[in-house]
Structures are given as C-alpha cells and as structure tokens.
From Swiss-Prot:
EC main group: hydrolase
Alphabetically ordered keywords of this record: DNA damage, DNA repair, Hydrolase
Keyword DNA damage: yes
GO biological processes: base-excision repair
Protein name, entry field: Putative 3-methyladenine DNA glycosylase
PANTHER family per record: DNA-3-METHYLADENINE GLYCOSYLASE (PTHR10429:SF0)
InterPro entries: Formyl_transferase-like_C_sf, MPG, MPG_sf
GO molecular function: alkylbase DNA N-glycosylase activity; DNA binding
EC number: 3.2.2.-
Similarity remark: Belongs to the DNA glycosylase MPG family.
High-level lineage: Bacteria, Bacillati, Actinomycetota, Actinomycetes, Mycobacteriales
Amino acid sequence: MNYATAGVAASTVVENRDVTIERLHRAEPVDAARIVLGSTLVVGDVRIRIVEVEAYGGEKDGPWPDPASHSYRGRTPRNEVMFGPAGHLYVYRSYGMHFCMNVSYGPVGVAGGVLLRAGEVLDGCATVQARRPRVTRPAEWARGPGNLGSATGVTLAENGAALFESDSPVRLEVAESDGWVSGPRVGVSTAADRPWRFWIPESPAVSAYRRSPRAMSADEQMG
C-alpha cells in the first residue's frame, strides 16, 4: 500500500522568530513537521538544510496520543523538553552512541516533537568532514538522525537550547521547502503507518524508508 502524499509549502523566505514560535506553539504534529522541513540548522560554522523530518505526538491522554513517542507514558526528566515551550531542542542518545535532535512544539504542558532525520550541509564542510572522516559522499554526511547529530557536534549539553535566540548554541532559521512528500515513519513498531514522515523528494540526503519488522498495522493494534 502506498501511503505517500505530496504538497507544496507556502514560502522560501526566512520567517520572523516570533511568528515561527507562535506557529509552533499552535501547531499539531503534521503542521509542526511542515514548519521545520526546509529550515536551516546552525551550529557554530556549520549550516545544514533540513530535508527530512518526522512528527511525534504526545501522551496517551493528550490531544495527539502517539505510542511511538518518548512522551506517550508521561513526563520524565529525559523528555521534559517535549512538554514545552515550543521552539526548543530536545536531544536524546540513541543506542548509547548517537545524539538525535528534535524541535518541541505545541502549548506548554502538551508534549510534541519533530525529529530531524536528515540534512544537506550548506556551510562548514571542513568541520563536518572532520567529524565524519570515513564518509566520502557529502550527501551522506548528515543522512539519518544519528549522523545528523554527529555532523553538527550536538550532544546532551545542548538539550533544551532555545532554537530562536540569537545567542543560542544551536539555532533554527525557518524557511519552508518548495515541495514535500509524506509517508510512514522509519523503524517504529507502533503507529507505524501514520504518514508523519516528511521529506524533500529531490534531495540526495534523504534516508531510505525501512519498516520495523515488529511493526503492527492499525488493525492489529486495535485487535
């Protein structure tokens, strides 16, 4: 079954920070993902255009319950940033070695995060190459959430960073992409068929879709 859908985003102009924060504050999962897609992540001299994201909802009794989300079972010290305010960086460690980045969205007290899955390096190529010395193709420098974290050098020290403050160690410049495609999220075992992964189809940095071998269909989960 083909779950992919496509559309056109509204603008390629960098938004005013207050406008962006307000949009993220009011956003639901799909809206938040489309806001973040096409934005530029800035960490030191490295600038990376975000070409693939995934939306994750929140608690099981919240407005957009998502069993694949870190916040589904409630607030913890680890997922605190997901509960707001909007526009902050949620960093977590994956498999004990990779650092993955998310953008918080939604009202304060309501959990939500947009996972940054892949990007194209615009500036700071020498820095990124030094961090990823075994990778020879630029399109692969920041392909996949763990590799994107490695390319930026972000660690748990940046967890909670305010992405739209000028003095933040990690900043996000929002300019929506000219086009997008959506489909199921990668590697999740629950809510696997939700088309909450968004990507820019012409980008060579987008990762390949992989369905989790443990994934259940919507009917199986309800049964």
